Amino acid sequence: MKRLTTKAALQAYRQSQDRNLTIGFVPTMGNLHDGHLRSIERACQDNDRTIVSIFVNPLQFGPHEDFDKYPRTFDRDCQLCQNAGVDAVFAPSPEELGISGRAQADTDRRTSLRTTVVPPPKMTSILCGRSRPGHFNGVATIVTQLLNLVRPDRAYFGQKDAQQLAIIRQLVRDLSIPVEIVGCPTVREPSGLAYSSRNQYLSEGQKERASVLYRSLKRAQTLFEEGFRDRAELLDAVKTELATVPELRLEYLELVDPDSLVPLASVRRKGLLAIAARVGETRLIDNLLLNARAPIIAIDGPAGAGKSTVTRQIARKLGLLYLDTGAMYRAVTWWLAECGVSIEDESAVAEALQQCDLQLQSDVEGDRCRVWVNRQEVTDAIRSPEITSAVSAVSALPVVRQFLIEQQKRYGETGGLVAEGRDMGTCVFPDAEVKVFLTASVEERARRRKLDLERQGYEVNLDRLEGEISERDRQDSTRAIAPLKKARDAIEIQTDNLSIDEVMDKILHLVPAGR
């Protein structure tokens, strides 16, 4: 693992990497705990190379905050990163990032003569921004600088800092920074207390009392799952539980939209319950996402594992949309042919995709999705021999894959779907309620494929099929965009000795009751 402390060293490292390798980036302030490590492990799983930054950012600390006593554990952090599979740690000094020594003084951190990134005031004046003016300007300034230096494909931030996550996502959209921002679930101690570098300021008794934050949020979540959506009802539930620990001093309790941070009167689709309080002198934050959408079932696995058949039948049985990702690639292939665009010209492909309005709808009378492109139904047209022969080359284009991942995520906003592919649970729907990794041995998949081809009148060699399937697995697992990987929280189902009905039964048992 490389230890880099200068911008020049970081740039040299990035230039030494193959351009086709994906880069994951986890920005931290060090003093790593299990929450950081879970994000780092996710980045290592998702990318070819992972870079972690360790930088205690002076610009995000206000006067009389804990900048000077914030724990610095660099050697320990580097060892944890190395153990987790990190490829490089970037640990610059404030001066290296253009923060003068004078600007590191308590009274002058935010008045240095440097460019400052200012996120939308409506996002920074609420929640933590009320008591920490200027904090998110400091965060946004350094995060922007780090993203420009590292130039990652994906950057990972914890959901515990939900306001920061929303602001960074907005910043990346507004400034057109070419990076995917990945939110990582909050990691908790056995008591429910969210991991935080500031937990070490707490005594054991204070930690126990602080666990009321999560209990109070869970109490509101229980009401939400029972159908309560009104702001007052949900906040009252939190306050009732908080009242059991009188030593806790509440700073704020809010129900907001998780993307815009606008306060909500009630939850229609999703809401963020956010809380900040002090236990002793230590300030703690926590939150829970309340999601009213119908469930998403993400089924991944290698080619030939039976995903398509199972996914269609699961969708029909549960009355959910079958998100036919294969049909989406076919529809894009049809559209490019209609536009007369050569797939050799990726910029022209990108332009054409911006004019492609793709819509899917379940076909209640059959197993297929009905597909429209710009209000023209193409359900049958995309199954033509010409489209079938061209779809593989179109699917290999990074710009097409990225476009369709965004389209698939759009369908996920309302939920109520079953999707199959190779990256549904890792890339497209990382927060799916049910994640399944459906697999089978190469030998079994080759046997199934041989039977299918023989039914169609073809004679095939089993050994050759096994070789082709093994090579397809290798290509799918190593492709630059959306490689085939099992999600950490996916349930693996080995189908070698299972019927379709048995596989479906196993998946249906994973769906939450009442969904």
Task: Kindly give the residue locations of the regions a language model identified.
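ATP-dependent NMP and nucleoside kinases share a basic, alpha-helical "lid"
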Residues: 166-169, 175, 379-456
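Small-molecule kinase domains that catalyze NTP-dependent phosphoryl transfer to phosphate-bearing small molecules
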Residues: 91, 363, 408-414, 422-431, ...
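Conserved lysine of the Walker
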Residues: 307
